[in-house]
Amino acid sequence: MEKIVLLLAIVSLVKSDQICIGYHANNSTEQVDTIMEKNVTVTHAQDILEKTHNGKLCDLDGVKPLILRDCSVAGWLLGNPMCDEFINVPEWSYIVEKASPANDLCYPGDFNDYEELKHLLSRINHFEKIQIIPKSSWSNHEASSGVSSACPYQGKSSFFRNVVWLIKKNSAYPTIKRSYNNTNQEDLLILWGIHHPNDAAEQTKLYQNPTTYISVGTSTLNQRLVPKIATRSKVNGQSGRMEFFWTILKPNDAINFESNGNFIAPEYAYKIVKKGDSAIMKSELEYGNCNTKCQTPMGAINSSMPFHNIHPLTIGECPKYVKSNRLVLATGLRNTPQRERRRKKRGLFGAIAGFIEGGWQGMVDGWYGYHHSNEQGSGYAADKESTQKAIDGVTNKVNSIIDKMNTQFEAVGREFNNLERRIENLNKKMEDGFLDVWTYNAELLVLMENERTLDFHDSNVKNLYDKVRLQLRDNAKELGNGCFEFYHKCDNECMESVKNGTYDYPQYSEEARLNREEISGVKLESMGTYQILSIYSTVASSLALAIMVAGLSLWMCSNGSLQCRICI
């Protein structure tokens, strides 16, 4: 009878109603790194490092770049005859110059403060070329004879289009005194130059006067130049050299020129009609007839990610450049399907729901939820409230990280002349240092936020478990694996009340108490039965052993194998 009661009790325990708390799992193979672990598989993740580009030069916010092709900035501004396609250019978003353009200063020489001029151009989006001193106004000097085979055009000698090389006329070079007053509302970029002959004979041949000078003055500029006559090696067939200068003439200011030889006079100037963010980008790419918000020398980036690893030099609304190869943010949970046992490991920032052995692939409509089983069946149900709060929290966190890191950031190359190489090297070291710091900060941020996110999910599962536990109290038994076993019948309506937090503890407490006491009594009674059976079994086996030993002894004595002596 006792065995029958025990068997019925066991059967009733197996068929008890249950509710379990768990979390979502899927077939994702996405992996993230945290402070504590590497390559943690998660249900959802978001890459925040852009690694792709289109390999083209594109319009920036609908404005085309000025692609100088085989011309340099100097060749464009002075008017190298091979750069005639850039005589008048529309508004540009940025300027593209090749690393070693073929059409630079056709007549050999130097461009003074060239790097500073390029820096100025990085804040200009449009020039308007205007004539300030007409070529025809030089009646006392030869304005058309100043050409060179170093600057050919259609097989003939020519010269820079925007300046005039003045030569003596009728064996005389009268002293020049010219002024130009800037009556425009915009600043003017004005260029001029000086010719340095190869020897004294060339000096008098071109300018008649053996000793010459050039004076240039504005409200902020006071310059006096003299030619440097010296024997030099030929470049582009020329032993002479030319040196070019520039200045910005403010509105209502005047520029004054005085010279008695070697003067390369301005004919055209550039009115700065639009200022803005621009850049001079070194690139060999071709125009791709495309549009972008971020351009690099390697190609355009169209991405909302906060970081990229394509090229450190950029123009536009660009992510920050880092040296990392991988930056992935966890947005979902640890992906540990139920077939795999979960390691009970505590995170860095909070408690982990390590009592749950694995996630549920059957629960697809939420991150956290329930699995129940009763006489009416079984099924999964997501906890929509906790899931939505978690989604909002993680989404806000990811957006916050992206917003904080996605500030408008431009990094354009700086150019230095030969005398500034030490400054250039120091600048490169500083920029490399900044990139190292940015990279370290980005990687550390991702590691810490991933740790927080995973612990945040674990904490939410534990909170859901505690919510159920506090409702059920002693009306159910904790099984230690995230499940509760009811001491009373719990139909679907009852299960739903547990899930939505309206479980009526008093309604089921009496039934639960009786079932709990009955199960406890069965356990005690069955324990007493087992004790009696064990004592009986011990005594019986001992008695049987004694009889066997006595019988064996008598048999051995009877056949002489064993001698028995009784001493009194």
Swiss-Prot record:
Site (Cleavage): residue numbering on this chain: 346-347
Disulphide-bridged cysteine pairs: 20-483, 58-290, 71-83, 106-151, 294-318, 490-494
Region forming the signal peptide: 1-16
Keyword DNA repair: no
Lipidation (S-palmitoyl cysteine): 557, 564, 567
Cellular compartments annotated: Virion membrane; Host apical cell membrane
UniProt keyword list: Clathrin- and caveolin-independent endocytosis of virus by host, Clathrin-mediated endocytosis of virus by host, Disulfide bond, Fusion of virus membrane with host endosomal membrane, Fusion of virus membrane with host membrane, Glycoprotein, Hemagglutinin, Host cell membrane, Host membrane, Host-virus interaction, Lipoprotein, Membrane, Palmitate, Signal, Transmembrane, Transmembrane helix, Viral attachment to host cell, Viral envelope protein, Viral penetration into host cytoplasm, Virion, Virus endocytosis by host, Virus entry into host cell
GO BP, one annotated term: fusion of virus membrane with host plasma membrane
Glycosylation sites: 26-27, 39, 181, 302, 500
Post-translational modification, as annotated: Palmitoylated. In natural infection, inactive HA is matured into HA1 and HA2 outside the cell by one or more trypsin-like, arginine-specific endoprotease secreted by the bronchial epithelial cells. One identified protease that may be involved in this process is secreted in lungs by club cells.
Membrane topology summary: Single-pass type I membrane protein
UniProt GO cellular component terms: host cell plasma membrane; membrane; viral envelope; virion membrane
Cytoplasmic-side positions: 553-568
Quaternary structure (record): Homotrimer of disulfide-linked HA1-HA2.
HAMAP family assigned: INFV_HEMA
Misc note: Major glycoprotein, comprises over 80% of the envelope proteins present in virus particle. The extent of infection into host organism is determined by HA. Influenza viruses bud from the apical surface of polarized epithelial cells (e.g. bronchial epithelial cells) into lumen of lungs and are therefore usually pneumotropic. The reason is that HA is cleaved by tryptase clara which is restricted to lungs. However, HAs of H5 and H7 pantropic avian viruses subtypes can be cleaved by furin and subtilisin-type enzymes, allowing the virus to grow in other organs than lungs.
Biological role stated in the UniProt entry: Binds to sialic acid-containing receptors on the cell surface, bringing about the attachment of the virus particle to the cell. This attachment induces virion internalization of about two third of the virus particles through clathrin-dependent endocytosis and about one third through a clathrin- and caveolin-independent pathway. Plays a major role in the determination of host range restriction and virulence. Class I viral fusion protein. Binds to sialic acid-containing receptors on the cell surface, bringing about the attachment of the virus particle to the cell. This attachment induces virion internalization either through clathrin-dependent endocytosis or through clathrin- and caveolin-independent pathway. Plays a major role in the determination of host range restriction and virulence. Class I viral fusion protein. Responsible for penetration of the virus into the cell cytoplasm by mediating the fusion of the membrane of the endocytosed virus particle with the endosomal membrane.
Assigned protein family: Belongs to the influenza viruses hemagglutinin family.
Official protein name in the record: Hemagglutinin
Naturally occurring in which organism (per UniProt): Influenza A virus (strain A/Duck/Hong Kong/2986.1/2000 H5N1 genotype C)
Lineage start: Viruses, Riboviria, Orthornavirae, Negarnaviricota, Polyploviricotina
